[in-house]
Amino acid sequence: VVLLKNPKVILSAGMNVGIKAARGECILKVDCHSHITENFIENNVKVIENGEYVCGGPRPNIIENEDNLSKTLLLVEENMFGSGIANYRKQTSKQYVSSVFQGMYKKEIFDKIGLLDEKVGRVEDNELHYRIRKNGYKIRYSNDILSYQYTRPTVNRMLKQKYSNGYWIGKVSHVYPKAFSIFHFVPFVFVLGIIFSLLMLPLTKLFAVLLVIAYGLFTILVTLMTIINNKFNATMLLIPILLFLVHFSYGLGTLVGLVKGFSWKKEYYKE
């Protein structure tokens, strides 16, 4: 085991340090806030040995603590409506996808596409995988490659994470617009809907009423289905509120990132 220094103290820079120092044929990314299974490395290697250049697999969420609120936060995180529109979050059959969590990469890929872009903050995976696809490589998904990610244990930490994710998506979309799918911007559209409805209130309440009814019914339905399919605890009644906070935080972050991205884009290309 070799411990390397990461002077810039950001994930993308740290991975670049590791890639430069690596002597093997493959690079395997393992994040903090995650847990890998016993055969995780072996199953990655098997897929690469079958001729693939990049691979990964499902990444269910887990919790560190077994208190009721943590369990409810996990349900919010797991819920398709609450988070996670990427293919790698769902257990599906073997296929090619646009992105994976904790991927294994043949080292030669980085000789062709370059290292990770250290300017893009929290969305280094999106940027990297976009350039991988752009250069003609495919990303292989296999159910056998299983790892877990720990859900943020408190509401504040979860909302901070969602805001930051949305912020960097909005910001980096000015430079890498094709690195993100339309689904990444759904919370942003939701926030725009709220702003538009509020602006229209002096003229009509129709838009605000329609938004509240549609969103309210949807979150209530999601909550009921979650309660039916899981062991009930009282904190589950907070799911509609938590979903709103998650969506609003993510969407607000995207809005702020998009606005700040105009000036950031100029600085990005100057460097």
Where in the sequence are the language-model features?
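The conserved acidic donor/metal-binding loop of glycosyltransferases
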Residues: 31-35
